Amino acid sequence: MIARSYDAKPFVKMGEPYFQCRDKLRQHGVVAFSSNYALYGDMSERVMSLIESMVPACEVYSIDECFADLTGIAGDLTQLGRDVRAKVLRCTGIPVGVGIARTKTLAKLANHTAKRLLSHTGGVVDICDPFKRDWVLRNTQVKEVWGIGKRMTAYLEAMGIRTAMDLAKADPWTLRQTFSVVVEKTARELAGTPCLELEEAAPPKQAICCSRMFGKRLTELAPIKQAVATYTGRAAEKLRDQGSVCKRMRVSIRTGMFNPGEARYAEGALVELPYPTNDTLLLTRAASEAVGQIYRPGFRYSKAEVLLMDLRRPGEFSGDLFAITQPVACDRLMTVLDEINGKYGRGTMRTASVPHAPDWGMRREMMSRSYTTRIDQLWRVH
């Protein structure tokens, strides 16, 4: 499971294999769908565009979340939240939660409360008022605060910090010395002091990962190399899309972790590239060689991962005046490759090691139709 609606969260854990929770989901009437990233991405863009049309500034934080700057807006902010929620629901059919507060961290808590108490809040909570803010802080466990993970929760609870209110009242400098500046900023934000600015332009990623489960267990090296080549090509597309190059990559493969009767194996290889690059051909060749080094026969492999690291803008690697750089011909080739795939669809042109319809691809028997992204799957109205 890679995503859950709020109502489904009590019945399934993030990352839990579907076969382990299938019966429980059916028992509670929870419907599961296979991943359809094209549809989700398109619907996300529609939701974000609608929100951006109603606020002065907006930061798209993830595929299903954004922050909006309401500075300068006069009138009832709660009503504005209701209007945003109603417009998104009317135009996309997607219900959203709206949290309004003076800092990002408080807005996350308000949003969480809006969804947790949906029948009372209508999906909108404004905690700009100190009394409402304090009520939410007192009734929120510290583990539910944005950026506080399980390990951090254990340390904080050992210090007597069990609620968001406890964290807001904790000494910021002590938190900084004991943990990090991140925890200090979180506490200050909970107390109402803004520490996190709105980022209207998303900063370039520091690493790019492409990882997938195989549709079936693989035992031979050849199909595993095909899968790694496929994931490398996708990661390289993302790399070029943000205008970056990489100097290192890590390739890893592993067996299933939820079958106690099977032998387990997991290994990865770190690859130093000859020069900073975003060339799919060079990256695929390096990834294929790495897989050959870490593959061991006799195991049933279930997943592969490609991680691109040391990301920079072209020209930022200046440690050696005479260092090799990516040939101009490679830049031109990748530009043409992206233009063709952008015009005719992803995968129209690809490396020869990437199959068109692999039998190891992800199983998507329960995938919803691509109603908004494919002309042959439009919703039919009779």
Regions found by a protein language model. Give the residues of each.
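Short Gly/Ser/Thr- and Asp/Glu-enriched loop/turn motifs at secondary-structure junctions
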Residues: 61-65, 101-104, 244-248, 299-303
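Short secondary-structure capping/junction motifs at helix and strand boundaries
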Residues: 30-33, 56-61, 77-81, 89-98
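Catalytic palm subdomain of template-directed nucleic-acid polymerases
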Residues: 68-85, 114, 160
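Acidic, metal-coordinating catalytic segment for phosphate/diphosphate chemistry
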Residues: 273-382
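Long, highly charged, low-complexity intrinsically disordered interaction regions
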Residues: 80-143, 305
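Residues that scaffold, gate, or flank divalent-cation-dependent active/transport sites
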Residues: 1-63, 67, 73
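DNA-contacting surface of Y-family translesion DNA polymerases
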Residues: 144, 152-298
